[in-house]
Amino acid sequence: MTRPLNALLCAALCIALPACAQSGTDTATQASLGERQLALEEHDGRCALVEPGQAGLDLQLRWPCRFHLDREGGLRTRQVGENRVLLVESSEKVPDSQDCRTEIQAVRTHGNGLEASKAVSRVAACPPFQWDEKVFIGLFESRP
């Protein structure tokens, strides 16, 4: 009696474990910024940054996009004056090449809201990549 029960239990675990492994949150499209819970979503083929209870912030990046992460997989941010700045990136492989077309847009805290940079940086590099800290500042100082 215990052999069939063990076999049934093993079969159930083989089915359930992969499902559990896939059910975690996607850290590349969901992040915490202090008390804020942020998510990236697709709006008409473009990326939008959404926060519960707030209006969505439409970005200039194509979907899919992701938050720029540090080496440990957490949201990489920089403090610039009174504002916290994060980066959102969208990347696609260049056909017949090892390069990618990557676009980066900065988003900063602004009072109780969020503000996206008007400028977007375009680079030929594939994520994951640790963008220079100047990118966090420069996208707000540049003109589009």
Regions inferred by a protein language model and the residue ranges of each:
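Bacterial N-terminal signal peptides that target proteins for export
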Residues: M1-L9
